Amino acid sequence: LHSLRRRQRQMCIRDRYTITEKHAQDLAEIAEVTGINGLRDLHRQEGFIAPLPEGVMEFGGKMFEISKDGTEGRSSSPNPIDVKRTVDAIREAKMTCEAVLVMVHSHEIRKDNDEEADYFLEEFARACIDAGASAVIGGGTHQLKGIELYRDCPIFYCLGNFIFENQYVRLLPADYMEKYGLNIHTAASIGIARRQEQSSHSLYEIPEVYRSVLPYFEICQGKCTHLELLPVELGMDRENAEKNIPYVADEKTAEKIAEYLTRVSKRYGTEWEYKEGRIVLHA
């Protein structure tokens, strides 16, 4: 194990929203009648905030770039300072270690589902491999995300859940209870039940939340030479006392995990199959 003393902070993410001139005009009109940008505009005039770059407008604290070719959408990128801080640490660790693994915890998503890694995470993970890391292991969201083999090194964008017992927490903060209109002294189990009641698809009803993999991989000369995945399920349909902890998945569930993993890994060109108790790369 190798640890490096570094400034402890979250990685800053830069979101980029691109809209047409017409939509920019619409936002400008809304900002004018609502005053949503009032304080920011005043601070910008007084020099407390940097001027907006040409072709960029602000709305409600978000920056929008006006498209020149009519394309619209969202993208994101990691703060270059944070990337440099991380890759410098990787290179330093490589001086005394045989292999460096990077762990990333992220709840950000690309658009409107939990299956796709955000743009910034892909850029950051590949930068870590470029700097000498042998694998990047992601966690955060409750569902498996795709697995990429980048320069013969695995990037697990998110491994999902392994132990999922948040239904059984004993205490929740006051703001959680207030958010759901409950007394701050309400039992945690009641607070969680209230969240479930008002959800259109509760986490506890989604099979993918209860399915994951346990990776096994071998590294030689900084590269992955062998990779296999143990399919696991967390007992979605079991009784409470046996629920939310990992079990080796049966063959039917394991095949579903392999199919799901192939679908969410499609953008990375990796296909998976279930074979002899393990999920492996499709030959």
Regions found by a protein language model. Give the residues of each.
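Short acidic, glycine-rich surface-loop motifs adjacent to enzyme active sites
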Residues: G60-R74, D88-N113
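A short C-terminal boundary segment appended to hydrolase-like catalytic domains
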Residues: R14-S77, I81, L171-A283
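Aromatic/hydrophobic pocket-lining residues that form the small-molecule binding cavity
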Residues: V83-T86, L121
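Single conserved hydrophobic/aromatic residue that forms the stacking wall/gate
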Residues: H2-I13
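A structural motif corresponding to the C-terminal end of an alpha-helix
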Residues: A89-E98, A131-A133, I219-C224
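Generic structural signal for well-ordered alpha-helices
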Residues: T86-R91, A125, L214
